[in-house]
Amino acid sequence: MDPLLTKIMPDRPGLIWMEQPVPYLRYSLLSSYPQLSHAVFTRNGGMSCPPYDRLNTSYDVGDLPRHVAANLAIIKDTLCARELMTMKQVHRTGILVIRTGGDRCRVQTPSADAVITNVPDLAVLVKQADCQGIILFDPKRSVLAIVHCGWRGNVANFLASVVARMKGEFGCEECDLLACIGPSLGPCCAEFVDHKMIFPEEFQAFRVKPTYFDLKAVSRWQLLGAGLTKDHIQISDICTRCRTDLFYSYRGEGTTGRFGTVAMLKQGEPRHANVH
């Protein structure tokens, strides 16, 4: 690995750092499954200029569209994806299900905060700048979910809804699901001065200082409550606000870009998909 990247990339157990064609990380929990491709891209290696430097994935933050398009093309090529799909993330609980079979229905930028799919060669990207990007994977049924979860998603227990939808739509069993929670706002920086107004009482168990909360631990607790097993959950302890050299942080920077968490199924031959 490039010596400069070695200096800036934190050494964390369970994270596999890659540097080509641009820097990104992979999870050890998911990396042994050949039917799944995934990556958490850093902010480095793209085309965008400050304050969006450099691998910004969002058209909605003020960056030049041609730079965003070039960055998304880099990500698509890195995963060798046939298609790359993004969502219009709205900090709510909308779930889009894309399944194989039937006529192809194209949805360019659906309003949703989670996608569940069994379609191969379709890469789905979550845009982040402090919120959690979470990958859920059922290796037995080759079903993938990718979730954007901010504090509002935690309050709504959005992850439990995603798990229930995976079970209802594809017959997934909770004990088979693997989950990875990526770089996001850490307990060191997740301050909510009005927490008594916005958080339910049970979140007090995750308060680390008078106004600071561990939202990654909240997500783990909610996944366990949804039926996942403890050893099937991996959490990155990287805080995006602390590591703006690697990731974008809305809290830390204000006007800035969005980094991407991407996942894609690879098994079998490509099939047509229905979206609903």
Regions found by a protein language model. Give the residues of each.
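Active-site microenvironment for binding and transforming phosphate-containing groups
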Residues: 1-276
